[in-house]
Amino acid sequence: MIGFLIALMVLPLATAVLLMLFRDSAGQNTARWMALIGSVVTLCVAVTTVAKYQSEMVITEASQPVQPRIEWRHTWLTYTPQLDSKSGLTPAPVKLEFYLGADGISLSLIALTALLTISAVLISWETIKERAAEFYICLLVLESCLIGVFLAFDLLLFYVFFEFTLIPMFFMIGLWGGSQRNYASIKFFLYTLVGSLITLVGLVALVLAAVKGGVTTPFSIPELASHFTAHPIPIQTQVILFLTLSAGFMVKVPLFPFHTWLPLAHVEAPTAGSVMLAGVLLKLGSYGFLRICLPIYRQACEQVGLPLIATLSVIGIVYGSLCALSQRDIKKLVAYSSVAHLGFCMLGLFALNAEGVTGSVLQMINHGLSTGALFLLVGMVYDRYHTRQLDDLGGLANRIPLIAVAMVFTSMASIGLPGLNGFVGEMLSLAGMFKVPVVGPFYAVIGTSGVVLGAWYMLTMVQQGFFGPLREPHDVHDPVRDMSPREACAFLPLAVMCVWIGVAPQPFIDLMKPDIQGIVTGYDGSNARTIGGSSGTPESLTAVDR
């Protein structure tokens, strides 16, 4: 199993290196096929890893609050701090490790990343005509960095991959984006970089506190969680560290009011860039909260995180929905819908109970599938009409019926129609918040308004753009082709997953259930409680290679 984890991270990077070596001799078509084959192989490895994870791991009790079920640790540096002059004791050596791991949460997000990368490659097949090899290199490096974030159980490794995701996305927007691509890419880079630098200060302070507390592996996320659960940091210090660490995560989500970089980045990014940005990159913020903040800063999350993040989340849900309702550019409409949908993720996450966190993780996956599919379809419309303005489009179902049907289906999934994927995540997130004493129902009721507003702006977009009298730009004269087989191959896997999760969500919940219960232990006192299953001691699957 350890080999699978390493392969997941190395395969996209190796494909990118091959493309880099042969980019001069390889033509456009060769570059496309190399990128497609590399991304398909990565998805196959991801699916195989999930299947083996479910069927072959030994079931044991979890030894720590946050423990990867598969892990590989390699010590690459040992450092002995200076003698403590006050106590006269020799400090224990501090180890720096290369610590990879996986559990049900990370494997679910890795599979999502691998699936969306294939869709991104296919949708760029004919639209990226200049420097195609370089474009696919950026895309594959981005995939490798994203997978690295989800596999990292070491703070240093996590931060390195977290930051490296900025570089390929910066180039994808800046080199292959729209007319304002330079401004959009710089704004995206600076916004996220400033937030991440503040997060770095929080990480350094956390590591120093761990070293002072005698932790010999101060970068190990599971050991930090275990240590600070048993020996909590004083609440005033904990709140400061929580807020510092949260800065980069809030920008990356993005939470209101740190969202202003997102609409422009989406509008100017190529279709593949928007798919990866909305589908996976925006999940890094909520994943950082889930993986680091919730297990380590428990009192701060309860006393400060819940009211602060829940307030910003419901504001983002309502504000993002109203902004989406006012948009005439379809791509910008979908971008603002992401602000609203990710508000549900954060609302469920900071319910700090099993239902809310389960709904939050499901919503991360569901948003990646449905919004990724929406950006694919918007890109298809733009490729045919060279506009995304609703004022220029209407009655398109008469000309491109397959794309229209796909847009209706995906809009229903995004709204949260029962039977499709969006319903499960939103309802669990809201149910978790309803359980929070005193303030929970207040936040949940406001959040519920986002469901109504979501139906309003998505149905308005579908009705105005795809039904009613035919309205097309004046410069369109040739017969407009409908969805091609290549585009269908990019879209259909996402649609299948939307139906699968909507109709049968339990296997996906079961995959993540023990890990979520480990994270919420100590918050709701329901460590043995399961979602959609029987009560009992939470199970964990462990395989260690040291």
Q: What residues fall within each predicted segment?
A:
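Transmembrane helix-loop-helix hairpins at membrane boundaries of multipass inner-membrane proteins
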Residues: 1-4, 21-122, 126-137, 216-218, ...
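Central hydrophobic cores of alpha-helical transmembrane segments in multi-pass inner-membrane proteins
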Residues: 4-22, 36-49, 110-124, 142-144, ...
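Predominantly late transmembrane helices and immediately cytosolic-facing juxtamembrane segments
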Residues: 256, 371-374, 444-479
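Alpha-helical multi-pass transmembrane bundles of energy-transducing inner-membrane proteins
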Residues: 26-31, 138-141, 145-233, 237, ...
